[in-house]
C-alpha cells in the first residue's frame, strides 16, 4: 500500500479543491486528518443530514472552560473536504494528532507564561 501526504493550507479554497481532486484520483483505503483522536466518534456526523459547515469541534476543561481548543471546519477547508470524501465514499477515516490533554496543557502553560511576562491590564491600570 502506497502512502501519500497531501500538504494543505488550512481554510484554503485552492487547497481544498486540490485535496478533493487528489483523493478522487488516488481512491485511498484510509485517510488521516489532523484532529483530536478523542473526537473520532464524531467523524460520522460529517455526512449527517443537515450538517453544513462552518462547524467546529470544541474541547475544553469542564472545571476551567476558558481553557479550550477549537478545530474549525469550513466548506473550503481541506480537512472538511477529506472528511466529506471519506464519508461519502465509505473510506476509513481517523483523526491523528496529540491527545487533547497535551493541547489543553499547552494552552494553560502559555497563559501562565503570558501572565508572568507581562502584568495584566488591570494590574497596570489605576483603579
What feature does the model see in each segment?
Residues 1-124:
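Compositional signal for N-terminal targeting/processing segments
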